Amino acid sequence: MLLLRPYEFWFVTGSQHLYGEEVLQQVEGHSRTIVNELNRDSVFPFSFVFKSVVTTPEEIRNVCLEANASEQCAGVITWMHTFSPAKMWIGGLLELRKPLLHLHTQFNRDIPWDSIDMDFMNLNQSAHGDREYGFIGARMGVARKVVVGHWEDPEVRERLAKWMRTAVAFAESRQLKVARFGDNMREVAVTEGDKVGAQIQFGWSVNGYGVGDLVQSIRDVSEQSINELLDEYAELYDMVPAGRQDGPVRESIREQARIELGLKAFLQDGNFTAFTTTFEDLHGMKQLPGLAVQRLMAEGYGFGGEGDWKTAALVRLMKVMADGKGTSFMEDYTYHFEPGNELILGAHMLEVCPTIAATRPRIEVHPLSIGGKEDPARLVFDGGEGAAVNASLIDLGHRFRLIVNEVDAVKPKHNMPKLPVARILWKPRPSLRDSAEAWILAGGAHHTCFSFAVTTEQLQDFAEIIGVECVVINEHTSVASFKNELRWNEVFWGRKQGLL
């Protein structure tokens, strides 16, 4: 996985001086115990740092300002162990710019029935302390995640861990750089968009680079580096017999290795973590990048075909949310309309990430009917099975919309021996008919990010943090209700942006 900086999450406990120093010491002790125990659990991808028990408006504001200034702090987790009058939190919450999670828990799991007294009641007040704090968040319209349950509960910890990855995706979003090689595919609408608006909203720096610059980087690759990479290919993947001996097939694979190394060097030199290509802008290149793109995606880079920079950035961020696992650029390619067994076959010309593979990928070389270049090498495989999501980010002109469809990937019942690309088969929820109708009504793109590892909840959380609309198509969706949701969202987001 493409390296991330060592992020951390600050744990801040709310209380007040009303209860005396002894109670505050107990509150701090309990808070430290929780943080220490959470840090022992490998489910968490990043560390927790206990900052303090805050008891005054000044302390609260200061810790929020410190969080804003810290490059390591990816989010703030708050918990009211006792009652903490929420007017104290106004100044701090007005300043806070980092993702916020409200953990509604308490130190003890069970009520000590035989020994409970008023001392215990005064100390363990999160049941109503967190409600007071929750009110001020609602009153101020603060975007925050609320997780409820005992801090030792595995489900609570799993939700915390996924939110941490989403918060880190937000941090990465604020510094994400996308390199565009060539422009968008000509006359295509949905891959266009407002790059300035995207940088303001998401933080993305999206810039174009001449294919000639990439070609020079490819030419600079040494033969020794190519040979070493070919050895790696032979170890990781199956390969057609002709690919293991001198000849045109071997040379095609060799060219993709050269492209991979040159492309990676260009991205590393510019600190890019996402990129696009297009088959219409390949001057000076022998092949459309195929195998090269697939392998870079597997390392954690975001990618979008035909100049689709929004999907490239989304793939990168979902890779972060997924820790690099089971996530790929995707396209709804063709339908299977068998009654009672409607399916969608997802694929692309070449560029599907092997992290979603169910079978050992095989390097093959086949003609590509568009682009006018030599036959490109690519990885061919069937995708895995299981629950997944397809996500699309579109530009509506006055705002962005994130569209999520929950799907179930299935194992193909038939071989596809003549299909020379990686592919995956899925059943969309609630059905192909209703999901496609809702998707089209929402303006969802034909390009998506497909993921086994990212959840709908994570994508909703990301949209909440970043401040964009998110609509979900799942087993509960009815088209009539979905159309109403789109209408209501138009009013809500228009008012939020001052357009109504």
From Swiss-Prot:
InterPro entries linked: Ara_Isoase_C (IPR024664), AraA_central (IPR055390), AraA_N (IPR055389), AraA_N_sf (IPR038583), Fuc/Ara_isomerase_C (IPR004216), Fucose_isomerase_N/cen_sf (IPR009015), Lara_isomerase (IPR003762)
EC number(s) recorded for this UniProt protein: 5.3.1.4
GO molecular function, one term: manganese ion binding
Cofactors: Mn(2+)
Key words of the record: Arabinose catabolism, Carbohydrate metabolism, Isomerase, Manganese, Metal-binding
CDD domains in UniProt: L-arabinose_isomerase
Bound cofactor: record note: Binds 1 Mn(2+) ion per subunit.
Positions bound to Mn(2+): E306, E331, H348, H447
Record's signal peptide: none
Membrane-spanning parts: none
Catalytic activity: beta-L-arabinopyranose = L-ribulose
Cellular component GO terms held in the UniProt record: cytosol
Catalytic EC class: isomerase
Biological process per Gene Ontology, one example term: L-arabinose catabolic process to xylulose 5-phosphate
Pathway: Carbohydrate degradation; L-arabinose degradation via L-ribulose; D-xylulose 5-phosphate from L-arabinose (bacterial route): step 1/3
NCBIfam families: PRK02929.1
Classification via PANTHER family: L-ARABINOSE ISOMERASE
Role noted for this protein: Catalyzes the conversion of L-arabinose to L-ribulose.
Family indicated by similarity: Belongs to the arabinose isomerase family.
HAMAP family, sorted: Arabinose_Isome
Protein name: L-arabinose isomerase
Protein's organism: Anoxybacillus flavithermus (strain DSM 21510 / WK1)
